[in-house]
């Protein structure tokens, strides 16, 4: 006969006692049905035992009991310290095992250490990390609405955080339902409560590196796209990207998780701001003139949270707040080697296609396509990078318009009452306004977000820099097409034609964009 050792965790019995029963060998059975089949013939024999045996009888006859593999803890040195705490000398080799408590341990000795420290009886379930047990959520109780082919779920504003299988924390279970409906995913619930932040270290020793002449450490990374999310909240192409960033910037970014970073977006309570309807039925939101910049999910900086509410009400959009503060400016370097270029009369010429795919440069100028931006850099010897695709959107520097009185007209429009005092300011669009108040009035009337570049007239603007080589009208211009849009609404075929017009206008013409008007 073989003794069967019962490590019990429940009941009023002594938790440190092992109860030994003479039974036939009980193999490890992973499936509930098999466990029930083995337990059944033993149940009748055990019913005649003493009272404490009934605990074992109950545990055996439950089909869902966790049968684990007992770890041989005698292999590891152990003892009790001077302070009375137990210790186990565990090796530092990483051989993850999953315990019967659902926790992953670095190796089998980790289970021994845990049991000794906590007086527990955890056993090994299987080798390797514990596999998360996903819980499918019943989304039928939540109202679903289909608009323009998109399914939206109406969720209650109840904060009961749950962790999704994508390692993202949702406000409640309905949040997972809403995300799945909106993005056509199948995310399930891992557990109640917020997701635990599991930070993984990256082994950078496997990537070759070199030190440049200026003392910078450069890491040679493979061109493999396997996105990882760093602890700084940025997504890197692969783990090596984190290594390269740390070496170059002297930082200590670790890997937060595999896959792209997902940003938790705080909700804005737009009900706190007063609204009114115009005669045309449009909803207007009255916002306080407080400058607390926030970044929207559309990549645009708003004066404050109310600005997002007003934008959504006016345009029927669903922009949310990405984060407090201005949107971060990110740039993308361009590969200009793919475009043909040569030099004529000392001027670099780039052959660009007649394709309108507007891009915004880091200099705040809109270019007709990537090639036009390359041509600009070649001609002027600059290093302008691509900020983003599409036309540039003006970000708002600090401009305090709250000191100017406003009034609301009968049609619902708000206007600013400005004095006739001439105190010119230069705006971020390169235009001179009669005063700061006039600039505020322009923003309110035109729904723009122009900022103040400086006090005084715009003297050293983009146009002056762009045409600095043209002291007089050039009699000959080349025929390449690199469109320039002037403030007069005219599209000029290239820099030469635009700058000639700039000189002829007594240098009052401004460059609006490097694209067709």
From Swiss-Prot:
<dbReference type="GO" id="GO:0004867">
    <property type="term" value="F:serine-type endopeptidase inhibitor activity"/>
</dbReference>
<feature type="disulfide bond">
    <location>
        <begin position="90"/>
        <end position="109"/>
    </location>
</feature>
<feature type="disulfide bond">
    <location>
        <begin position="204"/>
        <end position="243"/>
    </location>
</feature>
<dbReference type="GO" id="GO:0045071">
    <property type="term" value="P:negative regulation of viral genome replication"/>
</dbReference>
<feature type="domain" description="Kazal-like 1">
    <location>
        <begin position="67"/>
        <end position="132"/>
    </location>
</feature>
<feature type="disulfide bond">
    <location>
        <begin position="418"/>
        <end position="437"/>
    </location>
</feature>
<dbReference type="GO" id="GO:0008200">
    <property type="term" value="F:ion channel inhibitor activity"/>
</dbReference>
<dbReference type="GO" id="GO:0005576">
    <property type="term" value="C:extracellular region"/>
</dbReference>
<feature type="domain" description="Kazal-like 6">
    <location>
        <begin position="395"/>
        <end position="460"/>
    </location>
</feature>
<feature type="disulfide bond">
    <location>
        <begin position="352"/>
        <end position="371"/>
    </location>
</feature>
<feature type="site" description="Reactive bond 1 for trypsin">
    <location>
        <begin position="92"/>
        <end position="93"/>
    </location>
</feature>
<feature type="domain" description="Kazal-like 4">
    <location>
        <begin position="264"/>
        <end position="329"/>
    </location>
</feature>
<keyword id="KW-0929">Antimicrobial</keyword>
<feature type="disulfide bond">
    <location>
        <begin position="477"/>
        <end position="496"/>
    </location>
</feature>
<dbReference type="GO" id="GO:0002020">
    <property type="term" value="F:protease binding"/>
</dbReference>
<feature type="disulfide bond">
    <location>
        <begin position="73"/>
        <end position="112"/>
    </location>
</feature>
<keyword id="KW-0722">Serine protease inhibitor</keyword>
<keyword id="KW-0325">Glycoprotein</keyword>
<feature type="disulfide bond">
    <location>
        <begin position="229"/>
        <end position="261"/>
    </location>
</feature>
<feature type="disulfide bond">
    <location>
        <begin position="98"/>
        <end position="130"/>
    </location>
</feature>
<feature type="disulfide bond">
    <location>
        <begin position="360"/>
        <end position="392"/>
    </location>
</feature>
<keyword id="KW-0677">Repeat</keyword>
<feature type="glycosylation site" description="N-linked (GlcNAc...) asparagine">
    <location>
        <position position="72"/>
    </location>
</feature>
<feature type="domain" description="Kazal-like 5">
    <location>
        <begin position="330"/>
        <end position="394"/>
    </location>
</feature>
<feature type="site" description="Reactive bond 3 for trypsin">
    <location>
        <begin position="223"/>
        <end position="224"/>
    </location>
</feature>
<feature type="domain" description="Kazal-like 2">
    <location>
        <begin position="133"/>
        <end position="197"/>
    </location>
</feature>
<feature type="disulfide bond">
    <location>
        <begin position="221"/>
        <end position="240"/>
    </location>
</feature>
<feature type="site" description="Reactive bond 7 for chymotrypsin and elastase">
    <location>
        <begin position="479"/>
        <end position="480"/>
    </location>
</feature>
<dbReference type="InterPro" id="IPR002350">
    <property type="entry name" value="Kazal_dom"/>
</dbReference>
<feature type="disulfide bond">
    <location>
        <begin position="485"/>
        <end position="517"/>
    </location>
</feature>
<feature type="domain" description="Kazal-like 3">
    <location>
        <begin position="198"/>
        <end position="263"/>
    </location>
</feature>
<protein>
    <recommendedName>
        <fullName>Ovoinhibitor</fullName>
    </recommendedName>
</protein>
<feature type="disulfide bond">
    <location>
        <begin position="287"/>
        <end position="306"/>
    </location>
</feature>
<feature type="disulfide bond">
    <location>
        <begin position="270"/>
        <end position="309"/>
    </location>
</feature>
<feature type="disulfide bond">
    <location>
        <begin position="155"/>
        <end position="174"/>
    </location>
</feature>
<feature type="site" description="Reactive bond 2 for trypsin">
    <location>
        <begin position="157"/>
        <end position="158"/>
    </location>
</feature>
<feature type="site" description="Reactive bond 5 for chymotrypsin">
    <location>
        <begin position="354"/>
        <end position="355"/>
    </location>
</feature>
<dbReference type="GO" id="GO:0005615">
    <property type="term" value="C:extracellular space"/>
</dbReference>
<feature type="disulfide bond">
    <location>
        <begin position="467"/>
        <end position="499"/>
    </location>
</feature>
<feature type="disulfide bond">
    <location>
        <begin position="163"/>
        <end position="195"/>
    </location>
</feature>
<feature type="disulfide bond">
    <location>
        <begin position="426"/>
        <end position="458"/>
    </location>
</feature>
<dbReference type="GO" id="GO:0051412">
    <property type="term" value="P:response to corticosterone"/>
</dbReference>
